[in-house]
């Protein structure tokens, strides 16, 4: 992970506001990033049976459909990365940060229409496919002041099983409660509105960015400084990204072009795809 631990500066212009973000580490442990691991304590009550797909280091061969062109982004870092396939999304998980590096979805109008009929049940659980020394557990979030923030939103899930899977802590990051229920929820809803208008599948990749070393819980779950959501529409060839601070006063800003987003992250989240 040392090779990702490089100093870079992100300059964003949002409504005439320029934000300089120095020494930020992203996607990995990475899009997420920066190693963070401590001893973990398992809770039998917290760990529930997870989806049957096994975790295979960065190998999404069992669920390529969630990635544009069937190709997952390659994250050039050390170990403790595990690919997790769920019914309606895929997670690249970092055992260093104990959070997703990114979460990929393939959405369309049919999926979202079905999702509107699914009742939500907030039953969070530690993902049993991850080693106890690499995952978050329910106690890490308890009393932390942070919400368990979905990367693949529960409101995107078209079946009861997919809904239940979305509450895996492998799909969560520590998120400011006001940001989670306010400006970030609006980004999620705006994305769904776009998908409902789109002509076919839309690929969405969501993840955290870490600019400091803040953690919660005895397992040291990293707290992201920012969140991003990348949207790609194959029918139009267009892609854009939302970028938002993990703060109570976060704002919904104009989306970034994919070119600018990719340059800042120095990471290609759409490998092999020609974006207009």
Residue ranges and their predicted role:
Residues 83-147:
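Short, His- and charge-rich active-site/binding loops that engage polyanionic ligands
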Residues 36-51, 93-100, 157, 177-194, ...:
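N-terminal short leaders/motifs
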Residues 28-29:
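C-terminal motif of bacterial Sec signal peptides marking the signal peptidase cleavage site
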Residues 5-19:
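Bacterial N-terminal signal peptides that target proteins for export
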Residues 20-24:
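Sec-dependent N-terminal signal peptides
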Residues 33-98:
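N-terminal module-boundary/linker segments of secreted carbohydrate-active enzymes
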Residues 128-276:
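Domain-level detector of nuclease and nuclease-like folds
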